[in-house]
Amino acid sequence: MDFNYGMLVPLSFIFGTISWRFLIATVFLENFKEWPIEKLIMPFICIHLFRYISISLMIPGLTSIGEILPFNDVLRLTLFDVACSILSMLSLFFLHKKWKGAMIFPVLLNVVGLLDLLIATLYDVPQFVANVTTLDARLFAVLTTFIPLIFVSHTFMVQLLWKYFRAKRQ
């Protein structure tokens, strides 16, 4: 009987997501519930500052991604991540300056970031699963630790944004 190694990618993603969810909910949020939403959302935004790191995916041979995905897909991943990095910088800048319309930037960050995750899940993850034995350790670690952190941070930011805009309507 052959073992399906490809299933280790989604399984590791699930474990990573659950782990980050527990960490954030039990350690971070428990201690900072009294903060205003504009301040509480900032650490979640900070997670996205470093998404520009996917520029390194464009360097041939640095990871195994070039053996798995076509160049245009790698370019798409990189551009979405760089856009999220820039949007997180703008979000933090305007939130720090207490600009009246600052919360629009976290909204844009979440729209772009969640769209990136959706497209990657639909088109790229199946390729990673099918080619799991060619993934290098760095790429596997990103897929199973950093991407779950990004996903969990988006879920918390969406919840905070929902609460923020609902409170503004009342």
State each model region's role.
Residues 11-24, 83-91, 144-160:
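Hydrophobic cores of alpha-helical transmembrane segments in multi-pass inner/ER membrane proteins
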Residues 80, 84-88, 105-125, 146-150:
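Hydrophobic alpha-helical membrane segments
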Residues 27-41, 94-104, 165-170:
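Membrane-interface helix-boundary motifs at transmembrane edges
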Residues 117-127, 137-168:
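C-terminal transmembrane-bundle signature of multipass membrane proteins
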Residues 11-72:
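A glycine-rich, hydrophobic loop/mini-helix early in the fold
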Residues 53-65, 115-133:
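C-terminal ends of transmembrane alpha-helices
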Residues 54-106:
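Membrane-proximal helix-loop-helix units in multi-pass membrane proteins
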Residues 3-5, 67-79, 105-106, 130-143:
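Non-cytosolic membrane-interface motifs at loop->transmembrane helix junctions
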